[in-house]
């Protein structure tokens, strides 16, 4: 595969056409994990650990890690002893993570290639925001989850302290694209990141949409002052 530095810089639009989003992630795949660590100032490792804890996985459980990218989160979840499969609609991302010893499947969150009630738990980290129809995706996640199973969504959200929120938005819209230019193979993708985070629902709004999609007992926990929120819900029996 050609090195991604040779790709034309490209970003998806906020209508999130699947082919555009997949192509954009194909273009950042080679340096994706490094770029995430840099732009999050190392917080990405803590966020993955916190997501695994929120999943409360047990050995032998079956877990779907959706929008898994290169599988770095899947490896984190597998530390629990659960059987974890990574799924993503960017074949470039899956190829970049092919060295990781976890099963990987190409799949669209809006039409998951799995049977009903296949998984004890589903996680999606920083991916629901990139789906054209997040509500349909959450219903698909419900379909493939066993009764009593759970969904954890890790996603960029709304900082809870107003002053910090202002500073964060300044970083997101102005500084982050400049940082991305130094490390990413497709810095324009991080302009899309900033714009999509700004347009994303806040914590309460996302919880309401989870409930409307059929998830029960929905709660959330803020990480890093609300830069990221973990939402968890359950499928009733």
Curated annotation (Swiss-Prot):
CDD domains: AdoMet_MTases. InterPro entries: SAM-dependent_MTases_sf, UbiE/COQ5_MeTrFase, UbiE/COQ5_MeTrFase_CS. The keyword S-adenosyl-L-methionine applies. One of its GO terms (biological process) is menaquinone biosynthetic process. Methyltransferase required for the conversion of demethylmenaquinol (DMKH2) to menaquinol (MKH2). HAMAP family: MenG_UbiE_methyltr (MF_01813). This is Demethylmenaquinone methyltransferase. It comes from Nocardia farcinica (strain IFM 10152). The gene is menG.
């Amino acid at each position: 595969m050609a090195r991604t530095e040779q790709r034309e810089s490209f970003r998806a639009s906020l209508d999130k056409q699947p082919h555009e989003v997949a192509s954009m992630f194909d273009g950042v795949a080679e340096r994706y994990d490094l770029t995430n660590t840099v732009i999050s100032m190392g917080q990405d490792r803590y966020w993955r650990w916190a997501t695994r804890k929120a999943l409360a996985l047990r050995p032998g459980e079956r877990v779907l890690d959706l929008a898994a990218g290169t599988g770095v989160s899947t490896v984190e979840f597998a530390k629990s002893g659960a059987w974890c499969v990574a799924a993503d609609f960017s074949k470039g991302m899956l190829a970049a993570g092919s060295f990781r010893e976890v099963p990987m499947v190409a799949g669209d969150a809006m039409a998951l290639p799995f049977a009903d009630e296949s998984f004890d738990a589903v996680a999606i980290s920083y991916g629901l925001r990139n789906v054209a129809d997040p509500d349909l995706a959450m219903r698909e996640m419900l379909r493939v989850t066993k009764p009593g199973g759970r969904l954890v969504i890790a996603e960029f959200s709304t900082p809870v302290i107003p002053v910090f929120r202002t500073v964060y938005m300044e970083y997101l819209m102005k500084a982050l694209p400049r940082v991305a230019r130094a490390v990413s193979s497709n810095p324009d993708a991080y302009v899309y990141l900033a714009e999509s985070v700004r347009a994303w629902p806040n914590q309460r709004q996302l919880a309401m949409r989870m409930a409307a999609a059929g998830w029960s007992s929905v709660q959330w926990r803020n990480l890093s002052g609300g830069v990221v929120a973990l939402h968890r819900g359950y499928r009733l029996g």
